[in-house]
Amino acid sequence: MEDFKNRMHKNADVQLVMAGVQYLAAIASMAVIVFGNIAEASDAVQLLVATTGIGLALSSFLFLNGAIDGYKAEVADLSSAEAATASGKLLQKQPWMFFRLFGITLTILFIVTSLRAIYS
Protein backbone atom coordinates (compact mmCIF):
# COMPACT_ATOMS: atom_id res chain seq x y z
CA MET A 1 0.00 0.00 0.00
CA GLU A 2 2.83 2.39 0.82
CA ASP A 3 4.38 1.74 -2.58
CA PHE A 4 1.08 2.68 -4.25
CA LYS A 5 0.92 5.95 -2.28
CA ASN A 6 4.50 6.77 -3.27
CA ARG A 7 3.72 6.16 -6.94
CA MET A 8 0.63 8.36 -6.74
CA HIS A 9 2.65 11.11 -5.04
CA LYS A 10 5.29 10.94 -7.77
CA ASN A 11 2.53 11.07 -10.40
CA ALA A 12 1.11 14.25 -8.83
CA ASP A 13 4.62 15.74 -8.71
CA VAL A 14 5.20 14.96 -12.39
CA GLN A 15 1.85 16.50 -13.32
CA LEU A 16 2.71 19.65 -11.39
CA VAL A 17 6.07 19.92 -13.15
CA MET A 18 4.39 19.34 -16.51
CA ALA A 19 1.89 22.10 -15.72
CA GLY A 20 4.78 24.47 -15.00
CA VAL A 21 6.57 23.50 -18.20
CA GLN A 22 3.38 23.97 -20.22
CA TYR A 23 2.77 27.41 -18.68
CA LEU A 24 6.35 28.40 -19.54
CA ALA A 25 5.80 27.18 -23.10
CA ALA A 26 2.59 29.21 -23.24
CA ILE A 27 4.52 32.29 -22.13
CA ALA A 28 7.13 31.58 -24.80
CA SER A 29 4.42 31.32 -27.44
CA MET A 30 3.05 34.65 -26.22
CA ALA A 31 6.50 36.15 -26.81
CA VAL A 32 6.47 34.73 -30.33
CA ILE A 33 3.04 36.27 -30.91
CA VAL A 34 4.07 39.71 -29.65
CA PHE A 35 7.63 39.98 -30.95
CA GLY A 36 7.15 37.94 -34.12
CA ASN A 37 4.45 40.22 -35.54
CA ILE A 38 2.04 37.32 -35.88
CA ALA A 39 -0.79 39.84 -36.29
CA GLU A 40 0.70 40.68 -39.70
CA ALA A 41 1.25 37.05 -40.74
CA SER A 42 -0.94 35.04 -43.11
CA ASP A 43 -4.22 33.59 -41.88
CA ALA A 44 -2.78 30.06 -41.80
CA VAL A 45 0.13 31.11 -39.60
CA GLN A 46 -2.20 33.03 -37.30
CA LEU A 47 -4.45 30.00 -36.95
CA LEU A 48 -1.47 27.72 -36.25
CA VAL A 49 -0.07 30.00 -33.56
CA ALA A 50 -3.49 30.55 -31.98
CA THR A 51 -4.20 26.82 -31.90
CA THR A 52 -0.79 26.09 -30.40
CA GLY A 53 -1.20 28.76 -27.73
CA ILE A 54 -4.68 27.64 -26.77
CA GLY A 55 -3.57 24.01 -26.68
CA LEU A 56 -0.64 24.84 -24.43
CA ALA A 57 -2.80 26.86 -22.06
CA LEU A 58 -5.51 24.20 -21.81
CA SER A 59 -3.07 21.32 -21.39
CA SER A 60 -1.24 23.19 -18.64
CA PHE A 61 -4.50 23.63 -16.78
CA LEU A 62 -5.33 19.94 -17.22
CA PHE A 63 -1.94 18.96 -15.78
CA LEU A 64 -2.42 21.38 -12.88
CA ASN A 65 -5.89 20.01 -12.25
CA GLY A 66 -4.56 16.44 -12.18
CA ALA A 67 -1.82 17.39 -9.75
CA ILE A 68 -4.29 19.12 -7.43
CA ASP A 69 -6.55 16.07 -7.47
CA GLY A 70 -3.56 13.85 -6.66
CA TYR A 71 -2.54 15.99 -3.71
CA LYS A 72 -6.12 16.17 -2.45
CA ALA A 73 -6.30 12.37 -2.56
CA GLU A 74 -3.10 12.19 -0.52
CA VAL A 75 -4.66 14.42 2.13
CA ALA A 76 -7.74 12.20 2.23
CA ASP A 77 -5.50 9.13 2.70
CA LEU A 78 -3.60 10.52 5.70
CA SER A 79 -3.77 8.35 8.77
CA SER A 80 -4.65 10.04 12.05
CA ALA A 81 -0.99 9.90 13.10
CA GLU A 82 0.12 11.47 9.81
CA ALA A 83 -2.60 14.12 10.02
CA ALA A 84 -1.38 15.11 13.49
CA THR A 85 2.12 15.97 12.27
CA ALA A 86 3.09 19.48 11.20
CA SER A 87 3.31 18.37 7.57
CA GLY A 88 -0.10 16.71 7.78
CA LYS A 89 -1.66 19.83 9.25
CA LEU A 90 -0.07 21.95 6.53
CA LEU A 91 -1.38 19.64 3.80
CA GLN A 92 -4.89 19.84 5.22
CA LYS A 93 -4.82 23.66 5.17
CA GLN A 94 -3.85 24.04 1.50
CA PRO A 95 -6.28 26.25 -0.45
CA TRP A 96 -6.88 23.73 -3.25
CA MET A 97 -9.83 25.64 -4.70
CA PHE A 98 -7.77 28.84 -4.86
CA PHE A 99 -5.03 26.99 -6.76
CA ARG A 100 -7.62 25.63 -9.19
CA LEU A 101 -9.22 29.09 -9.66
CA PHE A 102 -5.80 30.66 -10.14
CA GLY A 103 -4.97 28.09 -12.80
CA ILE A 104 -8.20 28.58 -14.74
CA THR A 105 -7.88 32.38 -14.47
CA LEU A 106 -4.32 32.24 -15.79
CA THR A 107 -5.42 29.96 -18.61
CA ILE A 108 -8.33 32.19 -19.62
CA LEU A 109 -6.18 35.33 -19.47
CA PHE A 110 -3.54 33.70 -21.62
CA ILE A 111 -6.06 32.57 -24.23
CA VAL A 112 -7.82 35.94 -24.40
CA THR A 113 -4.55 37.88 -24.53
CA SER A 114 -3.14 35.61 -27.23
CA LEU A 115 -6.22 35.88 -29.41
CA ARG A 116 -6.39 39.66 -29.00
CA ALA A 117 -2.70 40.01 -29.86
CA ILE A 118 -3.06 37.85 -32.95
CA TYR A 119 -6.35 39.15 -34.33
CA SER A 120 -6.19 42.82 -33.36
Predicted regions located by residue number:
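Juxtamembrane boundary at the C-terminal end of a transmembrane helix
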Residues: 110-120
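Single-pass alpha-helical transmembrane signal-anchor segments
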Residues: 58, 108-111
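Membrane-water interface of transmembrane alpha-helices
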Residues: 60-78
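Membrane-associated alpha-helix detector
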Residues: 1-58
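Short membrane-interface loop/juxtamembrane segments of multi-pass integral membrane proteins
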Residues: 1, 5-8, 75-98
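Terminal, low-complexity, charged helical segments
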Residues: 33-43, 49-56, 66-69, 83-93, ...
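Core segments of transmembrane alpha-helices
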Residues: 24-30, 100-109
